Amino acid sequence: MSETGRAEVTEDQVRSILRVRRGRSRIFGEGLFSDPAWDILLELLAARLANRKITLSELSEVAPKSVLARWIATLEEKGLVTCELNRFRTDDFRVALSDDCADRMIAFLSSARHLAG
């Protein structure tokens, strides 16, 4: 925990989790672990920790854009992400974790790290 009582999770730690998950897909095949929701949330957390805004197009490594759009809509309905239209590209928008989701993910990843350690 930090001095403020908040769990510490770094962008590098989140990126490491993403690399492991992608390696798992390479070994076991793409279709076996096909639900992209967790990977979307991890990508958005990594972007937030790096103080970057990310667009739907930038998430295309996670899943095809049509699949991403459906999942982003579901995550937005659940209050886990927020969306902001891109005024320069009407076919793209910025996506970010809600503050509550970011806090919950950091708490989860911090507790998971302590369980593994």
Ranges and model annotations:
Residues 1-4:
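Intrinsically disordered or compositionally simple regulatory linkers and C-terminal tails
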Residues 99-117:
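Short, amphipathic alpha-helical interaction segments positioned at domain boundaries
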Residues 88-97:
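Minor-groove-contacting beta-hairpin "wing" of winged helix-turn-helix DNA-binding domains
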Residues 50-62:
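Short acidic, hydrophobic short linear motifs in intrinsically disordered regions
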Residues 62-78:
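Short amphipathic alpha-helical interaction segments
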Residues 76-87:
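A short, conserved structural fragment
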Residues 14-42:
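Short alpha-helical segments that sit at the start of domains
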Residues 43-47:
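Short amphipathic alpha-helical elements of helix-turn-helix/winged-helix folds
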